[in-house]
From Swiss-Prot:
Its main location: cytoplasm. This is DNA polymerase IV. The keyword Cytoplasm applies. Its EC number is 2.7.7.7. The lineage of its organism: Bacteria, Pseudomonadati, Pseudomonadota, Gammaproteobacteria, Enterobacterales. Poorly processive, error-prone DNA polymerase involved in untargeted mutagenesis. Copies undamaged DNA at stalled replication forks, which arise in vivo from mismatched or misaligned primer ends. These misaligned primers can be extended by PolIV. Exhibits no 3'-5' exonuclease (proofreading) activity. May be involved in translesional synthesis, in conjunction with the beta clamp from PolIII. It is found in: Cytoplasm. GO terms for cellular component: cytosol. Keywords: Cytoplasm, DNA damage, DNA repair, DNA replication, DNA-binding, DNA-directed DNA polymerase, Magnesium, Metal-binding, Mutator protein, Nucleotidyltransferase, Transferase. One of its GO terms (molecular function) is DNA-directed DNA polymerase activity. Belongs to the DNA polymerase type-Y family. Residues 4-185 form the UmuC domain. Its cofactor is Mg(2+).
C-alpha cells in the first residue's frame, strides 16, 4: 500500500507578503488587480476570506465585498524563491515529488526510512521544517492514493493535516460529496445531483455501464474514485504543458492597433517565462486568446516550432478580423504549448 502526502501552502502568495511585511498580517489583503484596473484575485489571506474574497474572483467583486481590501500587485520572484526552498525541503525526504503549482505538490514516501517510515510523522516534520526555515505554514493530507491525499490536505486548514488510513477509506468515501473529487466542477456536480448522485456512496450503487453511457470516460473516473481507486503514480518528471501570459484591460479596445500594441508588450514576458522552463522542452504550438466584452472568448493556435512574435501577431490579426465582430476586447493572451523531446516523433506522425 502506498503512502502519499499532498502538501498545500496556506494562502501562499499572501503569506509571503505578510511574512515580509508584518503590518499586513491582521488586515484583509489580496494579490491581483488594482482599484483602477480590472483583473482577478490570485490569492487572499484569511482576514479577506472572512468577507467572502476568494481566488479567481474578479477584483471588482472582491472590492464590493471588502471595500477596505488592500490589493498588492504580486512579487513573483519572491514566491518562486520560497517555492524553491519548499521543494528543497521535500527533497530531503523523497525524490518522488510531483509539483502541481508553486504552492502544492504530491510526495510519495512509501519507501522512505525517515520518521520510522510513518507518512503522518513525515508530513508533520515537513510542515514544521517549512515553518522553521521560511516562517510560512502549510497543510497536508496523507492517504494511500493521490486524489484522497489532495482532498485530505484541505480538511484541516490552515496549518494542519488530515490522515486517511487504508482502513478509513471505505467509510470516508461513503459520505464524500462528489463535488470534492478533483475534476468534478459545478456543471458536472449539478448534473450528477439531478440524477440523485451526490456522494461517492451513491456512485458505488451505480452500474459502471450506465456511468460510461452517460459520462463517457469521465464515468469510469467517477466510478474508480468512488471505489478509492487511483493508480496514478507520483510523477517527478511531470511535464509542464504550456506557458502563457495574458492581460485584462482597464478599458475594452475596439481597434486592431491597440491589440497589436498589447501583444508587443506581452511578448517579452512570454519570452521570459519560457526561458524558465527546462531547455529540453520544445514548442509544439503557439497561439493567442481574445476575451470579448460579452465574456465569450476564443483561442487560435497552430503548429510552430519556435517562438515568433510576427507569427503571433499574424494569428491575432486573423482572429481579430474573423471572430470579433463588433465586440470590444477586454483580455489579450499569448501562449505556447510545449513538447517533450520523447514525444516529438508522435506529434510529427500525428500531423
Amino acid at each position: 500500500m502506498r503512502k502519499i502526502i499532498h502538501v498545500d501552502m496556506d494562502c501562499f502568495f499572501a503569506a509571503v507578503e505578510m511574512r515580509d511585511n508584518p503590518a499586513l498580517r491582521d488586515i484583509p489583503i489580496a494579490i491581483g488587480g488594482s482599484r483602477e484596473c480590472r483583473g482577478v484575485i490570485s490569492t487572499a489571506n484569511y482576514p479577506a476570506r472572512q468577507f467572502g474574497v476568494r481566488s479567481a474572483m474578479p477584483t471588482a467583486m472582491a472590492l464590493k465585498l471588502c471595500p477596505h481590501l488592500t490589493l498588492l500587485p504580486g512579487r513573483f520572484d519572491a514566491y518562486k524563491e520560497a517555492s524553491r526552498h519548499v521543494r528543497d525541503i521535500f527533497s530531503r525526504y523523497t525524490s518522488l515529488i510531483e509539483p502541481l503549482s508553486l504552492d502544492e505538490a504530491w510526495l510519495d514516501v512509501t519507501d522512505t526510512p525517515h520518521c520510522y517510515g510513518s507518512a503522518t510523522l513525515i508530513a508533520r516534520e515537513i510542515r514544521q521544517t517549512i515553518f522553521n526555515e521560511l516562517q510560512l505554514t502549510a497543510s497536508a493530507g496523507v492517504a494511500p492514493v493521490k486524489f484522497l491525499a489532495k482532498i485530505a490536505s484541505d480538511l484541516n486548514k490552515p496549518n494542519g493535516q488530515y490522515v486517511i488510513t487504508p482502513a478509513d477509506v471505505p467509510d470516508f468515501l461513503k459520505t464524500l460529496p462528489l463535488a470534492k473529487i478533483p475534476g468534478v466542477g459545478k456543471v458536472s456536480a449539478a448534473k450528477l445531483e439531478s440524477m440523485g448522485l451526490i456522494t461517492c456512496g451513491d456512485i458505488q450503487q451505480c452500474d459502471l455501464a450506465m456511468l460510461l453511457k452517460r459520462f463517457g470516460k469521465f464515468g469510469r473516473v467517477l466510478w474508480e474514485r468512488s471505489q478509492g481507486i487511483d493508480e496514478r503514480d507520483v510523477n517527478s518528471e511531470r511535464l509542464r504543458k504550456s506557458v502563457g501570459v495574458e492581460r485584462t484591460l482597464a478599458e475594452d479596445i475596439h481597434e486592431w492597433s491597440d491589440c497589436e500594441a498589447i501583444i508587443e508588450r506581452l511578448y517579452p514576458e512570454l519570452e521570459r517565462r519560457l526561458a524558465t522552463v527546462k531547455p529540453d522542452l520544445l514548442i509544439a504550438r503557439q497561439g493567442v486568446k481574445l476575451k470579448f466584452n460579452d465574456f465569450q472568448q476564443t483561442t487560435q493556435e497552430h503548429v510552430w516550432p519556435q517562438l515568433n512574435k510576427e507569427d503571433l501577431i499574424s494569428t491575432a490579426r486573423k482572429t481579430w478580423n474573423e471572430r470579433r465582430g463588433d465586440r470590444g476586447v477586454r483580455l489579450v493572451g499569448l501562449h505556447v504549448t510545449l513538447l517533450h523531446p520523447q514525444l516529438e516523433r508522435q506529434l510529427v506522425l500525428g500531423l
